[in-house]
């Protein structure tokens, strides 16, 4: 009965674009109008405002965490199925990528995906975060780190997630994040991808 409303609420939470919200708070340009045009922490960092970028990262991750954690806490009282939790997880990411509050022009979903994974399986999230950190510090390319960590997510989920529907949700999340990085993949192939903090 509450499965569909739970998914809808998760989508709305995911639709809160912290890159845009934080930028407006600090009187900065809309991140969709400069750099890569992506409303995410990496692009906000290109503005030179490290605090704004950090808040964007935390906000985007937190909304994924809160959306799924809220559903998990209320799972028994509301009679939500495990499949509904999986759908809630996916909906939070879809909201971030296609936010109803911001003209359906959202980000690439890396931070939000991490928050979602943290709520579903802390171990899976930890594996992905460690991979991202190693790649980011090693190569200084955020998109490369994100792509490798994203690819590893479904594999880690196979070992750490208790429900098949959650594993499939993680796979779907990984596919969406990879698809949103199509331009980054092409730039990596051409050797034109910018490094962390580098202005375009």
From Swiss-Prot:
Name of protein: Glycerol-3-phosphate acyltransferase
Family statement drawn from the similarity comment of this UniProt entry: Belongs to the PlsY family.
One Pfam family, short name: G3P_acyltransf
Enzyme class: transferase
Record-level Gene Ontology MF annotations: acyl-phosphate glycerol-3-phosphate acyltransferase activity
Enzyme Commission number: 2.3.1.275
Organism phylogeny: Bacteria, Pseudomonadati, Pseudomonadota, Betaproteobacteria, Neisseriales
Regions crossing the membrane: 2-22, 51-71, 84-104, 114-134, 158-178
Catalytic activity, reaction form: an acyl phosphate + sn-glycerol 3-phosphate = a 1-acyl-sn-glycero-3-phosphate + phosphate
Organism in which the protein naturally occurs: Neisseria gonorrhoeae (strain ATCC 700825 / FA 1090)
Metabolic or biological pathway: Lipid metabolism; phospholipid metabolism
């Amino acid at each position: 009965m509450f499965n569909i409303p739970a998914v809808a609420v998760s989508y709305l939470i995911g639709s809160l674009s912290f890159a845009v919200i934080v930028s407006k708070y600090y009187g900065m340009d809309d991140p969709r109008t400069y750099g890569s045009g992506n409303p995410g922490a990496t692009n906000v960092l290109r503005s030179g405002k490290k605090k704004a970028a950090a808040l964007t990262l935390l906000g985007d991750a937190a909304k994924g965490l809160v959306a799924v954690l809220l559903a998990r806490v209320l799972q028994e009282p509301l009679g939500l199925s495990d499949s509904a939790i999986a759908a809630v997880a996916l909906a939070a990411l879809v909201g971030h990528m296609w936010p109803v509050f911001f003209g359906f022009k959202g980000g690439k979903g890396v931070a939000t995906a991490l928050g979602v994974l943290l709520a579903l399986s802390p171990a899976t999230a930890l594996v992905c975060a460690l991979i991202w950190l190693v790649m980011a510090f090693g190569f200084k390319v955020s998109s490369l780190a994100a792509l490798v960590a994203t690819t590893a997510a479904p594999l880690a989920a196979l070992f750490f997630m208790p429900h098949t529907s959650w594993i499939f949700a993680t796979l779907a999340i990984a596919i969406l994040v990879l698809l949103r990085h199509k331009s980054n993949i092409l730039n990596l192939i051409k050797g034109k991808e910018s490094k962390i903090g580098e202005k375009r």
